[in-house]
Amino acid sequence: KYALTKFHLIDLALKGSKNPINEFIKQFKKDSYFKSVVDDIKKVKRLKSKSHLKSVKKLGMACSYPGTFNSSIHSIINSTNYKGAILKTIKAGGCNCSRVNFIGAYFAALKGINTIPKSWIRKTDSAKKILDQN
């Protein structure tokens, strides 16, 4: 259900929602399947004023659910853009790849592809180039 929630949040962002997280809570607050997810999001929102590093240590640094989801939500609600959210998440440590892939997709869906720093894109090798090395 946490993975499915990620898809819902990205879909809401792509459809123009200004706040997909609040929209998700509104749409699914009475859905028994998503009850634990909605409760977790509300719990994370109560931690908004806490540092991201401390929150990740409390919510979960591993790649398993619900920790990876909850820590991702904390980064999202405490960030205004792709770069800030990604850097904050990487600096928090743990299995940050499981969090960063969702956070990156979320902000790209919410704010558009141009939110990804061009300098980061230039430093990234294409999959084709990597595969052609063999």
Predicted segments, located by residue:
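Catalytic phosphate/nucleotide-handling subdomain of diverse soluble enzymes
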Residues: 1-11, 67, 71-134
